[in-house]
């Protein structure tokens, strides 16, 4: 495929986060981040959650130590997102503030160390 050729229509990527316990991760994302549990494969080795326009997130059981994942999430109303996640009990490791690079941003960490940078221009 040449540089100017357009790729055929494909969907957006689906992240797969490494976790020590898939079921625990699903419950955390439901309770602390407002996600809906999608499915849990028999044997509890892989499962998924979803949230509005964000689409699904897959979890796969891994034996620690593993390298946590980092995701950037655009929030249309960053103030409302911050307050909502704070009220749900999300582990906000960096509060909402304007960063030197110009974004208003806050960071949430899950129990397995995966990070989500919620931001707005």
Regions found by a protein language model. Name each.
Residues 36-69, 115-120:
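Conserved short beta-strand elements that form part of the metal-binding/catalytic scaffold
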Residues 13, 45, 69, 102-104:
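Residue-level marker for the onset of beta-strands and adjacent loop->beta junctions
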Residues 1-26, 69-71:
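N-terminal beta-strand motif that seeds the catalytic metal site of vicinal oxygen chelate
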Residues 5-7, 38-39, 47-49, 61-64, ...:
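Short secondary-structure boundary/capping segments
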Residues 23-36:
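Amphipathic alpha-helical segments
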Residues 34-40, 92-95:
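Short secondary-structure junctions
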Residues 21-22, 71-115:
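Vicinal oxygen chelate
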């Amino acid at each position: 495929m040449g540089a100017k050729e357009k790729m055929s229509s494909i969907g957006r990527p689906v992240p797969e986060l490494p976790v020590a316990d898939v079921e625990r991760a699903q419950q955390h994302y439901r309770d602390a981040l407002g996600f809906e549990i999608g499915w849990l494969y028999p044997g509890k080795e892989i499962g998924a959650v979803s949230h509005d326009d964000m689409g699904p997130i897959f979890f796969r059981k891994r034996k620690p130590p593993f390298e946590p994942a980092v995701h950037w999430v655009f929030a249309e109303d960053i103030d409302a997102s911050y307050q909502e996640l704070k009220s749900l009990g999300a582990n906000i490791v960096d509060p909402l503030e304007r960063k030197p690079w110009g974004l208003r941003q806050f960071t949430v960490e899950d129990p397995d160390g995966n990070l989500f940078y919620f931001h707005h221009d």
